[in-house]
Design a protein with these regions (language model features):
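Aromatic-lined substrate-binding rim segments of carbohydrate-active enzymes
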Residues: 111-114, 120-237, 241, 252-254, ...
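Conserved, mostly hydrophobic/aromatic
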Residues: 65, 117, 170, 261, ...
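Short Pro-Gly-centered beta-turn/loop motif in secreted/extracellular proteins
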Residues: 99-113, 489-498
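Active-site beta-loop-alpha junctions enriched in small/polar residues
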Residues: 90-94, 122, 182-184, 274-277, ...
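Glycoside hydrolase catalytic-domain groove-lining segments
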Residues: 136, 143, 157-176, 287-404, ...
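Hydrophobic h-region of N-terminal signal peptides that target proteins for export
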Residues: 10-18
Length: 516
């Protein structure tokens, strides 16, 4: 794209008209040197040309439609109304933004900018009490409750709404739902603290004292349990001998959770992150087929828990729902793990890959020209994942603005523009999901400036960057002439179209068409 992106007049979801501001899309446009010369050298015209060529090659297709009643030589209007490609976002702040107006603006993004919503199923806040999953809305999930909270982030279910009302909203607006995550080893964000008391005998709890120095929770900010030197020294066989039932008990509990959630929603959830962030355990050889325990990076996990999670999910999931694996791991071990699981018979439909620039300094470094998330690095990772033969979902995307001032917004917008274009151009890419949509609405410890919107739901420049790409640059709208026998040919982005023409009787007709 060789023109300056101006946000004047680009209004969406009742956001109103923004002040006239812009951000550069090339070094030639960057008169104020928002980005360094070194940055533009990395994202040079040759790279941009390759991206454009790959978008044309991988994201578009040729359409042929026969309109029997169309008069040859007359005009036919071709208008794309939706994408096959997934442009998603997490919906974690549903009804939690403090005012009806902010909540309404947030919800309306789903179906206008975003065509898929990631809905949270983190175990600890979803099942705070054993046997009492939070499917349905209770008072503390309502907009009225959240509007009264002075410090909403201190609530235990912040960013973890009950899923029923979220999914109902998505269904009413034609937005598919992605469930995240079913299985994850994280103690801080996933495993409930009640597990230890619920499934362990007194003897097992006493034995665990040798190996667990401190259990992770929301207060100590540990992602995994703090293990003792004895745990690190012990062999897997020694641990299994001392705790022979621990792994099977954990697996049984995980299987119960998967079965309950997946059966409850059936076809209403179109895809699931079956396992989240397990590649590190695979990379260090901790998951051993046939074993009862895994010496996980998080602490004790069931042996071979990734394979077991896919096996359990496959036994209960709808045939229409996709089963994803998801990870931040950037090394070759992630693709190797997927191929190993496939070889052993695991059904995996999509490879999820995360990209979080959580530290605002990272974006300053990128603007300065440091080699962080460069085209070469991204192509290498995507090519590695392509070897699995799976579609790729950029499942969690964080791009921070170094500040809330104009320059900080411009840096975020430029980085988002170039990264989205590159990701969109990758051969096996099927979707990109932005993580925190609103500033200051992430999880504790995450940056407060990673949104597309300020806290009051006023748009940042990064919003306009994405809105222009998704709803303008990457949507096909053209006019062609009807050929003989009403044949209509066009080339466009894959998705659903409305095709409008005047029939032989002089009446306007509209047909729908899916370009695959």
């Amino acid at each position: 794209m060789k023109r300056m992106i101006c946000v004047l007049g680009l209004a969406c979801v009742s956001l109103g008209v923004a002040a006239q501001q812009s951000f550069p899309t090339s070094q030639k446009e960057d008169k104020e040197q928002i980005m360094s010369e070194a940055y533009w050298k990395i994202w040079n015209p040759s790279v941009q040309k390759q991206i454009d060529q790959d978008i044309e090659k991988y994201r578009k297709a040729n359409g042929v439609v026969f309109l029997e009643e169309a008069v040859p030589g007359t005009s036919v209007q071709i208008k794309q109304v939706s994408h096959d490609f997934v442009f998603g976002a997490s919906m974690f702040n549903f009804n939690q933004l403090g005012t009806p107006a902010a909540n309404q603006r947030y919800k309306e993004l789903f179906g206008t900018l975003f065509n898929r919503a990631t809905v949270p199923f983190y175990w600890e806040p979803f099942e705070m009490q054993p046997g009492r999953p939070r499917f349905r809305e209770e008072y503390w999930d309502t907009e009225a409750y959240w509007n009264r909270q002075e410090n909403p982030k201190y609530q235990p279910h912040w960013r973890r709404p009950a899923p029923d009302p979220m999914i109902a909203y998505c269904e009413s607006h034609g937005v598919p739902v992605h469930g995240h995550p079913l299985t994850w080893g994280s103690r801080r964000w996933q495993h409930p603290n009640w597990i230890v008391d619920q499934i362990l005998t007194d003897e097992e709890r006493e034995t665990l004292k040798q190996y667990v120095a401190e259990y992770a929770d929301e207060k100590n900010f540990l992602n995994g349990d703090k293990m003792t030197p004895a745990f690190e020294k012990a062999t897997l066989a020694e641990l299994e001998a001392k705790l022979p039932e621990l792994g099977p008990k954990l697996q049984k509990l995980i299987d119960k959770r998967i079965t309950e959630i997946v059966k409850y929603y059936g076809d209403r959830v179109s895809s699931w992150d079956v396992v989240n962030e397990s590649a590190q355990d695979y990379a260090k050889g901790a998951m051993v087929p046939g074993s009862k325990l895994c010496k996980s990076n998080y602490g004790f996990m069931p042996g071979d828990y990734t394979f077991e999670a896919f096996k359990t999910t496959a036994s209960v999931v709808s045939e229409n729902a996709l089963m994803n694996i998801n990870d931040y791991w950037g090394g070759p071990e992630y693709a190797e793990q997927i191929k190993d699981l496939q070889k052993r018979g695991a059904r995996i439909d999509v490879a999820g890959s995360q990209m979080h620039l959580f530290d605002p300094k990272q974006c300053l470094d990128i603007a300065a020209g440091k080699e962080i998330q460069t085209p070469t690095q991204i192509w290498k990772l995507m090519n590695s994942l392509t070897e699995t033969g799976l579609p790729i979902h950029l499942s969690e995307i964080t791009i921070t603005s170094p500040g809330s001032d104009l320059k900080g917004q411009q840096i975020q917008a430029v980085i988002a523009q170039n990264l989205y274009r590159l990701w969109f151009s990758c051969k096996n890419m099927m979707g990109i999901t932005w993580w925190n949509v609103v500033d200051d609405c992430g999880a504790p410890g995450e940056p407060s400036v990673s949104g597309l919107f300020f806290r009051d739901m006023s748009p940042k420049l990064s919003y306009y960057a994405l809105e222009n790409l998704i709803n303008h640059a990457w949507k096909t709208e053209t006019e062609v002439k009807a050929g003989k026998n009403g044949e209509v040919k066009f080339r466009g982005f894959r998705g659903n179209y409305e095709i409008t023409y005047t029939d032989k009787a002089g009446n306007e007709q509209t047909v729908t068409y899916h370009l695959k």
